[in-house]
A protein has these predicted regions:
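Bacterial extracytoplasmic/cell-wall-associated proteins, especially those involved in peptidoglycan
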Residues: 37, 44-194
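Gram-positive cell-envelope targeting signals
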Residues: 1-47, 55-60, 80
Length: 194
């Protein structure tokens, strides 16, 4: 009798998952990362929807990650710090500045708006940026950031440039080939006081 109940429960769970449109053992985040690297927005969006449904139906304690943000953050990390020899910390620091800007009262509140702001990053409808296919390392850095991991842990760091900006340099990253990248604090640090 116990064996029949186990088989029946397994069959019901499988049928429930199949009706739901997701597979319980599929790693949809891995599919999202693959889609980012392949430049396949439709596949990534579909995987994100299935992942969100799986998290909700199975009551999993996973952070929600929007595919649009994973897509854009992976691309900007690749554009700004995609060189294969640059360490993961550098890639994540670049991405964290974008997230800090999204949370800042000084900048727009969405990733797309932050990246498309005039004079910042690559702007709107940029063929170079639009055509980028990030490396898996850049996509992984974006995933880690969107899931809450931080390397700077300083919300007031809202500038990343080849020269000093803002009120202070928080961190200078140096590379023999690329030179220095400065991660700088806002000109209005009082906005970030806890």
């Amino acid at each position: 009798m116990k064996r029949i109940l186990i088989i029946l429960c397994a069959a019901l769970m499988t049928a429930s998952c199949a009706a739901a449109g997701y597979a319980p053992r599929t790693d949809y985040m891995a599919e999202m990362l693959e889609a980012v690297c392949a430049g396949d927005y439709a596949a990534g969006s579909a995987a994100a929807e299935k992942r969100a449904e799986k998290i909700a139906r199975m009551a999993l304690d996973y952070p929600q990650v929007e595919f649009e943000e994973l897509w854009l953050l992976s691309k900007i990390i690749y554009a700004e710090a995609g060189s294969v020899w640059l360490p993961m910390e550098w890639k994540m620091a670049v991405g964290e500045v974008v997230l800090n800007r999204m949370a800042s009262p000084e900048f727009p509140g969405t990733m797309r708006e932050v990246l498309e702001q005039p004079g910042q990053y690559y702007g709107k409808n940029n063929p170079y940026f639009d055509g980028l296919k990030p490396s898996i390392e850049c996509a992984e850095a974006a995933r880690r950031l969107l899931e809450g991991e931080r390397v700077l842990r300083a919300p007031s760091v809202v500038f990343q440039s080849n020269y000093r900006l803002g009120s202070a340099v928080f961190l200078e990253l140096k590379d023999a080939l690329l030179g220095s990248t400065y991660l700088c604090v806002s000109s209005h640090p009082e906005l970030y006081a806890a």
